[in-house]
Design a protein with these regions (language model features):
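Charged substrate- and nucleic-acid-binding regions of tRNA-handling and nucleotidyl-transfer enzymes
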Residues: 1, 120-124, 176-214
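Glycine- and charge-enriched loop/helix tracts that form the active or gating conduit
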Residues: 1-87, 91-109, 113-127
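Generic structural signal of hydrophobic/aromatic residues within well-ordered alpha-helices
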Residues: 2-6, 21, 33-34, 44-48, ...
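Short secondary-structure junctions and interdomain/linker hinges
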Residues: 9-12, 28-32, 40-45, 55, ...
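General structural feature for long, well-ordered alpha-helical segments within catalytic domains
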Residues: 17, 33, 68, 87, ...
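A glycine-rich phosphate-binding loop feature that marks nucleotide/adenosyl-phosphate handling sites
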Residues: 39, 51-54, 90, 134-142, ...
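Histidine/acidic-rich helix-loop-helix segments that form or flank divalent-metal centers
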Residues: 56-74, 127-184
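Active-site lining segments that contact anionic ligands and/or coordinate catalytic metals
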Residues: 79, 83, 136, 163-171, ...
Length: 214
């Protein structure tokens, strides 16, 4: 009956939809619900539909875009900002897909496209501004190169602050866990970066005035 009556969701207030979707995304069985009720989820968020079953044609990915997204959600802390960022981080991929002559799929510009789509979706669902800003930032930077190098990590901390930087590293790690086995070696890099963040902060190398010890 849920699948049959999914159109009724269109009559429910965005705020109510947001509460229920957030509960579902953060629940223990989120992956199963996302698989079994993808069509229902696509009523309030139709932008998800192109992801369902979309092949990536890339050795770094052994899953379609939707299954990869579910794997990332499963691998990340069940906290609203992180789970929503995981849901939306690759939403722009299908519209950015191109197939090279060698048969390898590419998604050039998908971070920008996903960011734009995430902003639109989160606004439509009446997200509070602070959460929306955090989620959009994570989507925007989810594909940036991360190395276990102090200088760029200090720059990240300076630009985004501790909490957002830690969230970003966690999303990168979850994203990698959702990719094929040949990418798994990168997990160690994110572990190293997390440790590096701890060391930098312990040394009180603070870069924003509000974080300076007075």
């Amino acid at each position: 009956p849920i699948h049959r009556n999914k159109h009724l969701l269109k009559g429910i207030a965005a705020e109510r939809i947001l509460v229920e979707l957030t509960k579902m995304l953060c629940a223990q069985g989120a992956a199963g619900v996302l698989r079994d009720f993808a069509d229902v989820l696509a009523v309030p968020i139709p932008e998800l539909t192109p992801m369902f079953g979309f092949p990536q044609h890339n050795p770094h990915h052994d899953k379609d875009v939707w299954e990869h997204t579910i794997a990332v959600i499963e691998s990340i802390t069940p906290e609203p900002v992180l789970r929503w960022a995981a849901l939306l981080h690759d939403i722009g991929k299908p519209s950015c897909f191109s197939l090279a002559e060698d048969g390898i799929g590419h998604f050039f510009g998908h971070s920008d496209q996903s960011t734009s789509m995430a902003e639109s979706i989160l606004s439509r669902l009446r997200f509070d501004n602070a959460s929306k800003e955090q989620i959009v930032r994570l989507v925007r930077y989810h594909d940036m190169p991360i190395t276990a190098d102090r200088k760029p990590i200090k720059r990240l901390l300076s630009k985004h602050g501790e909490d957002a930087t830690r969230q970003l590293i966690e999303l990168h790690k979850a994203d990698t866990l959702g990719q094929s086995a040949i990418c798994r070696h990168r997990i160690a890099i994110f572990e190293e970066v997390s440790q590096m963040i701890n060391e930098i902060l312990q040394e009180e190398s603070c870069f924003t005035l509000k974080d300076l010890a007075v």
